UniProtKB/Swiss-Prot annotation:
HAMAP family: SurE
Compartment(s) of residence: Cytoplasm
UniProt name for this protein: 5'-nucleotidase SurE
Main location: cytoplasm
Length: 249
């Protein structure tokens, strides 16, 4: 039986992680370690100025007073009795497509698995109602089983986005590239009860690059999107042009 580490950024009691853990437990030994609160948008942040504390919950999960990245790092380095065969992060309540991936704690948790030498996938449910976590969990389980026979390179992760639809309405799977959003909308300014100004982040930008071949396009058409991601952010097509002038400064 394989060993799977499960984490997320929505918190240890979120419906997505419960559905994911249940589906994977049908064929694997699963350890679920996740933040004790919602950490959406935490990206790859680590807790460096405070100690991490764990809490063993009644359902066997472990909560941590840290970020998604903290959870995966702590689990692999300290809590897992046997090194996991794979890290699975999710199921996120909402899309992680295009630019979202740079902010996502869900994707970051999977990336931390990759940084520690393990294959990893991030799974998100895309839609307005967010009720079909069972659909996303089924696909997550299928993908994990597939990776046992077709391992991915350890310098990448798979980013999976599943439409919020009943299983029978999913049209299939498409391997995609990341799309892109327009820039985010403005800040929302209001006041607290004491009359002091406070600010909220505005909505994310609307879809900009969402055509054929993108994650946005696949999900909108009713397909599960799977995008292989790597941590190398180098803009290779800019290297020569930049070197032509900047080394002369």
């Amino acid at each position: 039986m394989i060993n799977i580490l499960v984490s997320n950024d929505d918190g240890v009691r979120a419906p997505g992680i419960i559905a994911l853990t249940h589906a994977l437990s049908e064929f694997a030994q699963v350890l679920t370690v996740a933040p004790d609160r919602n950490c959406s948008g935490a990206s790859n942040s680590l807790t460096l100025t405070n100690p991490l504390r764990i809490n063993n919950l009644e359902n066997g999960y472990i909560s941590v007073n840290g970020t998604p990245t903290d959870c995966v790092h702590l689990a692999i380095r300290q809590l897992c009795q046997t090194e996991p065969d794979i890290v699975v992060s999710g199921i996120n309540a909402g899309a992680n497509m295009g630019d979202d991936t740079l902010y996502s704690g869900t994707v970051a948790a999977a990336m931390e698995g990759r940084f520690l030498g393990l294959p990893a996938i991030a799974v998100s449910l895309v839609g307005k109602s967010l009720i079909h976590y069972d659909t996303a969990a089924i696909f997550a389980a299928k993908i994990v089983k597939g990776l046992l026979e077709h391992p991915i390179s350890r310098d990448q992760i798979l980013n999976v986005n599943v439409p919020d639809l009943p299983l029978a309405q999913i049209k299939g799977i498409k391997v995609t590239r990341l799309g892109a959003r327009h820039k985010a909308e403005g800040m929302i300014k209001t006041q607290d009860p004491a009359g002091k100004d406070i600010y909220w982040l505005g909505p994310v930008g609307s879809e900009q690059d969402a055509g054929e071949g993108t994650d946005f396009g696949a999900v909108a058409a009713g397909y599960v999107s799977i995008t292989p991601l790597t941590v190398d952010l180098t803009a290779y097509n800019q290297l020569d042009g930049l070197a032509d002038w900047i080394i002369k400064i």
